[in-house]
Amino acid sequence: MTSKFRVLGAGVWGLAFSDYLLKLGHKVEVFRRDTKLSNKDITELKLYHISDDNIKSLDSLNDQKSNGEINIIAVNSKGFSELLNKHESYFRTLNEVVSLTKGLDHLSWKYFSDYVAGMFTNINKYGLISGPSFAKDLCYEKKISVSFATLDEELSSSMVDATKSSYFEMIPTTYIYHIEIAGIIKNIAAILCGMADKYYSKGVYSNVIIKKACQETWQKGIEAFNGYDGPIDVLNKDRDSIITSPGCIGDMILTCKQDQSRNYQFGKLIADADVSIEDAKSIVGTVEGYDCCITIIEKTQSTEGELSNLLYKIIKSQNTKREKLLRDFLQA
């Protein structure tokens, strides 16, 4: 069955996913600032089905009428709240939204699912796509399983069915908070893995850090339900399935062990005492783990989190003390 999609603010992942949807025979409109597909990062992808005809200016979004499309947010995390605020009149016409973007809004300190719920009472269906994959993996038809987190069974069924192929599948889950939190903590863990791989043989401490990342994800997910015994009892029963989902440990393993992860690259750079934090950021670009770590520690009321606390100490310490902080933590 053919579905209609609108992909909003698409970077390379959003474009790769749009190309995949077109390959499956769906109708896709992509709204982005740059309406040309000539960017180097884009031309390096194998995008065989998308063309300039599919691209519309993001500035025109408020003028669009909603006609049963599935809207997928595909901006980076820093652009999430900006997209919703700038195009508020468009989002007021929707009752469901799917997101490829996960993280924290650094001004309100809310998870994106909460940000949407607080801003738009009309949006009563929210879905999150998260899992172990890079954009080029989808373009090269690498076998991929991702989590699709939503509380709405109809949205879950429609997304799972519309996107399934011989090499791509969505695994449904209702645990949005844990999948969203895992997407934040994996980037913090990837920075620490990058540092550890610079100080030790590659991969020696990766599994230790990933295990702690899973524990931190679990703890922060439980925090969201403090005071509600019923949901926590259910969470405890489903703990293993949550942790082992593609959007949790699957995503962490990929991000923490791959050189192409920007957070991992950032970690390797700051492992060198001669490289400042700011220089490393300018080399790598947006570092989600760095930004989220600052927000978690300085802005939120969260108390749990070994890895968040450790990374915060590292990025606030003198350059020469970074190595000792990490070594002491790993060898404790």
Segments (PLM) and residue ranges:
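NAD(P)+-binding Rossmann beta1-loop-alpha1 motif at the extreme N-terminus of oxidoreductases
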Residues: 1-60
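NAD(P)-dependent Rossmann-like dehydrogenase/reductase catalytic/cofactor-binding core
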Residues: 3, 186, 193-194, 222-332
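Conserved active-site and cofactor/substrate-binding residues in soluble primary-metabolism enzymes
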Residues: 8, 12, 16, 75-78, ...
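Fold-independent oxyanion-binding glycine-rich loops
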Residues: 10, 33, 75, 100-103, ...
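Anion (oxyanion) recognition and catalysis
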Residues: 22, 164, 301
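Internal alpha-helical scaffold of NAD(P)-dependent oxidoreductase catalytic cores
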Residues: 27, 79, 90, 115, ...
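Rossmann-like NAD(P)(H) cofactor-binding subdomain of soluble oxidoreductases
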Residues: 51-143, 159-161
